[in-house]
Amino acid sequence: MRSFATQQNGIFKSVCSLDCPDQCGLLIHKKDGKIVKVQGDPDHPVTAGNICNKVRNMTERIYDEKRLTTPLKRTGAKGQAIFEPISWKEAIDTITSRWKQLIDEEGAESILPYSFYGNMGKLTAEGMDRRFFYRMGSSQLERTICSKAGSEGYKYTMGISAGIDPEETVHTKLFIFWGINAVSTNMHQITIAQKARKKGAKIVVIDVHKNQTGRLADWFIPIKPGTDSALALGIMHILFKENLHDEAFLSEYTVGYEELREHVKQYDPEKVSTITGVSTEDIYRLAKMYGETSPSFIRIGNGPQHHDNGGMIVRTIACLPAITGQWLHTGGGAIKHNSGILEYNTNALQRPDLLKGRTPRSFNMNQLGRVLLETDPPIRSLFIYGTNPAVVAPEANKVRQGLLREDLFTVVHDLFLTETAAYADIVLPATSAFENTDFYTSYWHHYIQLQQPVIERYGESKSNTEVFRLLAEAMGFTDQELKDSDEVLIRQALDHPDNPHLAEIDYDSLTKHSFMKAKREKPLFPGELPTPSGKIELYSEKMKQDGFPALPTYTPLVTDNEHPFMYVPGPNHNFLNSTFSNNEKHIKLEKTPKLFINTKDAEKHGIVDGAPVRIWNSRGECELTAAVGEQVLPGVVVSQGLWADEQGKKQLVNALTPDRLSDMGGGATFFSGRVQIEKV
């Protein structure tokens, strides 16, 4: 492994660590040992030197004076963020002595790790940490907050988390961005779409909010939250009725198309219009456009899956390319995630065999508040890393109430004293990605990339792998698996004979090339999919066995209160979840947290554009700035971004979101809450 950290000057290849599908190649400019500029790598075949504003300003985050430099011990009340510096030895001794006591008195399951992909590096997010907590026998975490519902739904149809190669979409003639603000969250897919548009391609956006991507589209279609499956079924109704389907493809590569043809007769445009808020004329127009344009491509976003019915929504949308046979056309098909193409050896990396036959209890991360407040026997210690649940998790007020428990020993490993860290007993300083050894796999394009250390550690910060090696040693765990170096971890993860796409990729080749493309000798079709039938399952017997309708179906959202407004807290352009929300430059770019309200609703409630507005339900309340217009349908309100706590302001939007779980995969239902609004 080469390390550029000791080299004082130069330009070095790197990779973006953010939880973003684009996983950009970077060039890091150093002078006198410090990063002075972050630039896109023009040699990367997909991202091609073009990077977002977040990464362009990454230097300010790396050298932010608010970064933690030493371990901290709480000296004030929980939540007040009053700490004193301590040594790493004291921190590790304090943590492990408490854990040993808890294990002796209450068992290892009284301890719970809580983490996610704030850094998408595989060692950082799911390497030595998994080994450590498996070895301990702690309670386990179901990490389902982001894409699990959609992944499960997509797999019922397609059998694998894979779609087409996005590089092929330069040939696409119709792009449908469905529930994704790609300008802000998948910018290079937009770049490709714009290239195709110069050759005549059309861009359609279906979303609850006319955001940056909606404004770029040739045609924006607003839709009521959680009704996407009804729209997809209405499109199928017309495709079959108007003979716009591909009978040969359906016969050869799918199962259940005859049953589906009969099933969708009930989803006529008039019925679907009532459900979705999309006019019958637009439903016809969209279906005709989709049925008559080839190749067509659907980019399925994360938005639709964050509903009570999110898995079924994605399962249903995933059926559409099969109806018109798009998978046989270069540039045709869909992408939800492409993580299946770059699937590495998770068993070798995470080593679940260290459980040694134990089956500890597990908890869904979306329900952290109720886990901390209601579990019996209780969780007595929480180790949090790679996430900021006091801002990011649903029912955030309940989460913070749980973190206030005096009998809860909480450790946070982070770059900053986050809102979550304010409740910790011990805080550990974390390295940035540019200080780590790691590897990254995109969940959109087909390239895997290696991260080599570019700069020296900031202060006394340590990487996740280093922290868990120290904890393992202090706990008396002598297993070699808990001593493996970062290089060994990467070698183990990339040794995956079951995935032929990685056949020519290993640690040595990645070290030489920095990034490499997965090997894909044949297209998705013709071929055999890993569904029970080996085909696209429009009718799924597996779904029936699992308690779901065998055919794609629309089911309404849960009504948890009688408030009149559906509330969708979407992402914004200059933050990534809570990352960058503490950076003054990014805050100034976003200006203020807004609530988008339809003109008719604003008039009814006496709310004017730019005025403060109270948004509330039984879970909590916020005060945001009204953005009045036609960006959302009547009965829908939308905010953008997860804003950092600020004295005297009520902008914690996840105080309003439910912690119910989605229909499939135990996913989050951020976008299925209801609220009331009123002028302040």
Swiss-Prot record:
One of its GO terms (molecular function) is iron-sulfur cluster binding. [4Fe-4S] cluster binds at residues 16, 20, 24, 52. Binds 1 molybdenum-bis(molybdopterin guanine dinucleotide) (Mo-bis-MGD) cofactor per subunit. Its cofactor is Mo-bis(molybdopterin guanine dinucleotide). Its EC number is 1.-.-.-. SMART domains: Molybdop_Fe4S4. Keywords: Iron, Iron-sulfur, Metal-binding, Molybdenum, Oxidoreductase. InterPro entries: Asp_de-COase-like_dom_sf, MoPterin_dinucl-bd_dom, Mopterin_OxRdtase, Mopterin_OxRdtase_4Fe-4S_dom, Mopterin_OxRdtase_prok_CS, Prok_Mopterin_Oxidored, YoaE_C. Gene3D superfamilies: 2.40.40.20, 3.40.50.740, ADC-like domains, Dimethylsulfoxide Reductase, domain 2, Formate dehydrogenase/DMSO reductase. PROSITE patterns: 4FE4S_MOW_BIS_MGD, MOLYBDOPTERIN_PROK_2. Residues 9-66 form the 4Fe-4S Mo/W bis-MGD-type domain. PANTHER family: OXIDOREDUCTASE YYAE-RELATED, TRIMETHYLAMINE-N-OXIDE REDUCTASE. Belongs to the prokaryotic molybdopterin-containing oxidoreductase family. This is Probable oxidoreductase YoaE. It comes from Bacillus subtilis (strain 168). The lineage of its organism: Bacteria, Bacillati, Bacillota, Bacilli, Bacillales.
